[in-house]
Structure formats: C-alpha cells, structure tokens
Amino acid sequence: MEKIKLNLLNAIDSSEILNYKDQVKEINEKMNRFEMIGSDFLGWKDLPNQINWDEFLNMEEKAKWLIKENVEILVVIGIGGSYLGARAAIEFVNGTFPLSGSKKLEIIYAGTNLSSTATAQLLAYVENKKFAINIISKSGTTLEPSIAFRFFRELLEKKVGKAESRKFIIATTDANKGLLREIVRKEGYTSFIIPDDVGGRYSVLTPVGLFPMLCAGLNVREILVGAQKSNDFYKKSDLEENIAYQYAVARHIMHTQKKYAVEVLISYEPYFQYFLEWWKQLFGETEGKNELGLYPSSKIFSTDLHSLGQFIQEGSRILFETVINLKKPKIDLDISEDKENFDGINYLVNKTLHGINVAALDATVSAHTDVAKVPNIILEIADSTEETLGWLFMFFERACAMSAYLLNLNPFNQPGVEVYKANMFKILGKPKK
C-alpha cells in the first residue's frame, strides 16, 4: 500500500502538471540509462534494491557489539549529508524524547559547527560516560568534522588508552581514497563504505545513515523495505501515476511560471524537525545554482504560527507551502474533563490531542488558501514508522533530482560552497598542496 498521498487541489490545476508529461518521461528514461548530466552520481536511485548485505550484517554486528560492551553513547561526527539523514531518521522514528528500555545507544552529533562552547559542552557531556565514535566523511578533509574528531578521539584515547580506543572508533568513508581512508589503514579502525556514485545529501540509505540508525535501535530492514516499495512506485516514467514527479513539476511551475521564490515545508510534529532539515539540504544544494531554484524553508506548526503566521497570512506573496499531514501519531492523548473547568477547555473533552492538532492543520490550510491565497501542497503520510520513512526518503530524492533536471541543472554538484571554504582556509593559513 502506498504510504504517501499528494493533494494539489489548493495549489495547481492537474492539467498544468500533465503538460510536462513528455518532458518528465524523457528525463526519467535518460536517468535510467545514465545519460543525464551528473549521471556518475545517480547510484542513490538504485540503492534500495542493491544493498550490500554482507556490509549490512557487519554493521548490525558492530552495533550489537557496542551495546554488549555497555557503550552508552555513539558520537556521530559529520556535517551536512553526513549526519542529517541519520538524525532525521532517528528522531522521525524514536521521537525527540524516546522512551527508554530498548537496547540502543544514545546518539549525539558533533562536528556540525565550529562553536567552541557547543563542542566543549559535548565533550563534558560524554567525559564520564562510555562512548564510541562514528566519524563520517568521504574525503576526511571537511574542517568541522576533522576538528571534532581530533577532540573526541583525544578524549577517548585518554579514557581507555590508544590501543583500546581503536575498537570504539568507526569510520564511514570512501572505499579506497581520501585522508580518512588513510587514517583507517594506519589505525585499523572498523570502517564502512560510502559508494563512489552517491553524493552526501543522497547518502542516507548508505552506511552514512544506516549505521547510526542501527545503533539507535531502528528497524533498518523496514526502512529498506519501504524504500524498495517506494522506488518501485516513483521510478515510473508515467507522470499520471508518479506523485513524486507530480510534486517536482508542481514546484517547477510555482518557481518558473508563477514566480514564487520560497517553498516552506511544514510539519505539525516537532520530532519531524530534522527530517525538514534533511529536506532543506537536499533541495537547497541540488537546485540552488545559476541563480535558479526555490529557497527551501521549513516550519513547525502550530509553534511557528505564533511567530510567522502573520507574515504568511498578510505579508509578501513570495512563498507557497507544502504541508505534511500525519494521519496516525505515535502516541495520542485524550482530553479529560475537569469539573471546575477553571481553564475553560472542557469543550475539548472527548477529543484527542492529535485530533486538535489536525483541526489546527485544517484551519490553517483554509486560512492560508481561501483567504490569503497562498498555494498549499498537501502530503498525507500514513504514520511515522520505519517503512513510511523509507517511502519518504525515496519520494523526495526522486522528486529533487527531477526538479533540478527540469531546470537543466546538475543535481549532484555544489560548486558555490567552495567560495567560502577557500576564503576561510586563506584566513586560517592552510598550506597549499
């Protein structure tokens, strides 16, 4: 059963979408033949059906070993696509405050910034706990993870000794080349491989994302099942049957014809926050080139309705919204009756908190579309299980690649980020090769 439903009624007419039927078919068939620009990095689209099960079993065994050794915390060190997918998945499935009791590690994230305070506080947090490190970098030269790895490696070596520390350091990197691979060879760390044909922001279903998920207790096999089913749906060339590509075309029309500059992805569940962050990187780096692309923004409602709801309702007409409508929450709560009704909310008795959240969603969509005339794309998802997560990952990755190809862009490069890096390294005095 399909886990995602797309509703474009409050955004765009279906006839406008189908005008792109032939173009989408041509692009998709060229993708399948690896004839599109950037085809060297199309490996992600077949990942769900080409899992390296030997490596997967090794990851499972390493995660079980860490738990058996009473490791309390896994420090995931990476930035951008090297950590966002894992964090998105772990919080999507476990929630922001996961219930205790199952055999899993606490996951914390380092190397995501250059803040001395944040890094010092993380080091202090793990200092008196048993921790392991998963350093994730294809090249091993990205500055933020490199600095964090030095700090955490030194702390781990100080706690257990250099020889023993090697057992608790896991590297996820290139199979053959790069500085981190050289370090792995020298130190003998356990390592898992980032495929050559998968870029960072598309790497969530490689060991980049899968190993931290396993350590966090997720049923990763179910994520892969969902991704496989999703891929079977969304690799089709027929636009009438492929809602991932319908979403891509809707975004394209909003940007190029209706001249919107911003897409806001909205969830009414706070634990979707890092899924939204993953989405922002995916679309921001994929589309933001040649002075093109929608600016990807995200909001958690109803929280952000109390800060930005006014702007969306009556401010500049620069944005449209894509709303994730979760049908079944992890946990629901009933509103109980209070005989004194001192808080004045007895009218909510016999309603559930999720039902009230859905009412807020429906009311907001109506206010934004009927009154403010802000287009709303609705993505209805069945639940927040592992299988549904797998569906979502492939839905958005397929849609994102198609969005870029419709703009005649290479979806898999990001040359613009090299500018600030070059400036920073010049200021810091990095030696030239």
Swiss-Prot record:
GO terms for biological process: gluconeogenesis; glucose 6-phosphate metabolic process; glycolytic process. Its main location: cytoplasm. Keywords: Cytoplasm, Gluconeogenesis, Glycolysis, Isomerase. InterPro entries: G6P_Isomerase, Phosphoglucose_isomerase_CS, SIS_dom_sf, SIS_PGI_1, SIS_PGI_2. Pfam families: PGI (PF00342). Transmembrane segments: none annotated. It comes from the Bacteria. The active site is at E285, H306, K421. It is found in: Cytoplasm. PROSITE patterns: P_GLUCOSE_ISOMERASE_1, P_GLUCOSE_ISOMERASE_2, P_GLUCOSE_ISOMERASE_3. Its EC number is 5.3.1.9. GO terms for cellular component: cytosol. Pathway: Carbohydrate biosynthesis; gluconeogenesis; Carbohydrate degradation; glycolysis; D-glyceraldehyde 3-phosphate and glycerone phosphate from D-glucose: step 2/4. It catalyses: alpha-D-glucose 6-phosphate = beta-D-fructose 6-phosphate. GO terms for molecular function: carbohydrate derivative binding; glucose-6-phosphate isomerase activity; monosaccharide binding. PANTHER family: GLUCOSE-6-PHOSPHATE ISOMERASE. Catalyzes the reversible isomerization of glucose-6-phosphate to fructose-6-phosphate. Belongs to the GPI family. This is Glucose-6-phosphate isomerase. It comes from Mycoplasma mobile (strain ATCC 43663 / 163K / NCTC 11711) (Mesomycoplasma mobile). The gene is pgi.
